[in-house]
Amino acid sequence: MHFHPVTIGLVSGIVIALGVAPLFFLALGAAGKLSEKLRADLWTRWRSWLILAPCMVVPLVLGRLPAIVGVGILAILCYREFARATGLFRHHVISAVVALGILLITFAAADHWYSFFVALSSLTVSVLVIIALFEDEPKGYIQRVALGVFAFLLFGVCFGHFGYFANDRLGQPLMLAIVVAIELNDVFAYCSGKLFGHRKLAPQTSPNKTIGGALGALVLTTALFGTLMHFTLAGTPLDRPIHLIALGVILSFTGQFGDLVMSSIKRDLGIKDMATLIPGHGGLLDRFDSMLFVGPALFHYIGYFKGIGLDEPARIFTGL
């Protein structure tokens, strides 16, 4: 199996970072820079990343189909957390249609059947609007349907676009670069906020986020992702400074908005985390909320200027 140089570099970087992190924690502890609470939190998060990192990286490295299936599983699990937090799971038929829509989106991506992939958005929304009538309960109809449509768009359509990248010959390094950059975008925002953050970005929605943190993340993530895209998209129409900067800006902005949207939902529900699956992080949706809008935004930008999977076989399963 041939691996793109960007893939090799990113995987190596992840392994090194996980290996060096304990030494960094020990050094900070010895210097008295860590409180007992912060020290315990850092070690908890590090242990969680020892499990999360392979779960994220291995499907992307194994190839096209494992990557798409992996994203589909993530979408279903995130939807499950959302449904339980919002109470949508109590409406069994609507919840089942949303789950089926996510599975069909995943199948369309795996089949590289783009017309079906696009059609599923309107088809699933239409089915949700109609199927909710069978409960014969007008009270709460708008809320039930809106939650179902919202959930499908977030976890079916948005994650589906990210998974569809795997159909491109550069899908592997591209998806891995997106994952690494979006996770570091959160780190950059946190560090920049500590250094330069004075004015709150959205105090009612996310009290810890600052304008300085958001701008710092924007600059640093744009530089990082633009550099990664230079090596990933070399020889394509997108390997130009204007496009590389635009890709970085899009990723950082959409990543931060994904986080803010989920924070707003949690504030509305009166909860801190969507779940407690991952120690130190909350649930899967708490960890991957920044990914929500990145997929569609980058997919259509890259698709417009370069195309996605145009040189790869389409309708792999249904076209036989």
Language-model segments: residues:
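Membrane-embedded alpha-helical bundles of polytopic integral membrane proteins
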Residues: 1-250
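C-terminal membrane module of polytopic membrane proteins
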Residues: 20, 268-320
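Short amphipathic alpha-helical coupling elements at transmembrane boundaries
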Residues: 84-88, 144-148, 197, 263-270, ...
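Alpha-helical transmembrane segments that form the membrane-embedded catalytic/substrate-binding core
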Residues: 189-190, 209-221, 251, 255-258, ...
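Short amphipathic alpha-helical interaction segments
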Residues: 237-257, 269-270, 276-280
